[in-house]
Swiss-Prot record:
Catalytic residues as annotated in Swiss-Prot or TrEMBL: E129
Alphabetical list of SMART domains matching this protein: Glyco_18 (SM00636)
Molecular function terms from GO: chitin binding; hydrolase activity, acting on glycosyl bonds
Gene: ctbs2
Protein name: Probable di-N-acetylchitobiase 2
Residues annotated as glycosylated: N51, N101, N223, N272, N296
Annotated source species: Dictyostelium discoideum
Chief location category: other
Gene Ontology terms: biological process: oligosaccharide catabolic process
Signal peptide, first to last residue: 1-15
Length: 385
């Protein structure tokens, strides 16, 4: 209760202190570009960004929200984004050990408001992925999101608050959050339909597998809706990266035609097998790996069960067989079609900077695969910069 009461004081003080400066310091030619976007709820194409220099290459006519995971933004980025009706939101996390600390929470919320207002941006994207198994702590996280959402909306009802969540609400990676509460206290959830093999149970021998399968995505969405969460509050997060599993442990049987690659057992949060046995690589690197004529690799194969591509190659240094699981335009399109069929709020990508933008032949179809979510997807022939 103390948090809620003091929130009104936070909002009043921040609003008063920023009202005189909100129109000054605008880096754009037109001051209206420094106002938060006033756009009603809409279908989403959200991009997570970790690189502050790539924005001139984005297809701004396809994006709706850009979640920023770096410290500062270029002035031009703000102007371009708002000119194209794209929200800029700050990716943020929170130390769960302070979830019961009301004074810390009050100060943290004020800092987030000041950050958003001083940068003329549009809200927050919560990316908390810590294990929480105590229902009391899970409820405290919901209360944090609720208090943050109320504080932001009291200043501007068009500020956006979104929450990144695991691909299923079934305590994935011991993230036993109050998902229904998080959904009802935010604009939408981003179900991260990747890293689906972070915990693999029931395998006597650990094996490599798909990073993002439609069957798991569907099961996860159904689990969310079973909690009473509307599909309109769910965004399907998809990967522009894959996993390389080094040294298939198949003995003499390992080769370029290997289908099932046995891997090392690397436990993670209670599971004996996990994708931690592999390493993440961005899509542009995997394309280069496939195109490298000095590396002996198989053709891209297709797993019909997981509806995902993979390939094998001989490591030129060790001579071992490595297996690669990733997503390409074909596998992404299947999941995007699923998102359409389920009437989800939209799609998202981790992360938007994992492409080689100088290679239009391979990068453009990845954009178009996600943009196909929209009934009349915008052409990506040119980025708007």
């Amino acid at each position: 209760m103390r948090i809620i009461l003091l929130l009104f004081l936070i909002v009043f003080v921040v609003a008063q202190s920023s009202s005189s400066s909100s129109s000054s310091g605008c880096p754009c030619d037109s001051s209206y570009l420094c106002e938060p976007l006033q756009i009603a709820p809409r279908q989403e194409f959200l991009g997570f960004s970790l690189n502050s220099t790539q924005y001139p290459n984005y297809y701004w006519n396809q994006l709706t929200t850009l979640a920023i995971f770096y410290e500062t933004i270029e002035d031009e980025l703000l102007c371009i984004a708002h000119e194209n009706d794209v929200r800029l939101v700050w990716g943020t996390t929170f130390p769960i050990e302070n979830l019961g600390n009301s004074s810390y929470i009050e100060e943290w919320i004020q800092e987030q408001i000041e950050k958003v207002q001083s940068t003329f941006t549009d809200g927050l994207n919560f990316d908390v992925e810590s294990p929480i198994t105590d229902p009391t702590i899970a409820q405290q996280y919901t209360e944090l999101v609720s208090a943050t959402n109320k504080a932001f909306k009291a200043i501007n009802p068009f500020y956006q608050i979104s929450i990144d969540v695991a691909w299923s609400p079934s305590c994935i990676d011991k993230r036993c959050y109050d998902y229904a509460g998080l959904a009802s206290n935010s604009d939408f959830l981003v179900a991260m339909d990747y890293d689906e093999r972070s915990q693999v149970f029931g395998e006597k021998v650990c094996t490599a597998g798909a990073n993002s399968s439609p069957s798991n995505a569907l099961a996860g969405i159904n689990n969310f809706t079973d909690l009473g969460i509307s599909t309109d509050q769910l965004v399907m997060g998809l990967p522009w990266y894959g996993y390389i599993y080094k040294n298939c442990l198949n003995g003499d049987e390992a080769g370029l035609e290997t289908v099932v690659c046995q891997i090392e057992s690397v436990p993670f949060r209670g599971a004996n097998c996990s994708d931690a046995a592999g390493s993440e690589y961005d899509y542009s690197y995997l394309v280069q790996l496939l195109q490298d004529q000095t590396i002996n690799s198989s053709a891209v194969q297709w797993n019909t069960e997981w509806q995902s591509p993979y390939f094998n190659y001989i490591d030129p240094i060790t001579g071992n067989v490595d297996q690669v699981w990733f997503d390409n335009p074909q596998s992404l399109s299947i999941k995007v079609q699923l998102a359409q069929k389920l009437n989800l709020r939209g799609v998202a990508v981790w992360n938007i900077d994992f492409l080689d933008f100088s290679d239009q032949y391979n990068s453009r179809p990845m954009w178009d695969a996600l943009a196909s979510f929209f009934p009349q997807s915008a052409s990506s022939e040119q980025s708007l910069n």
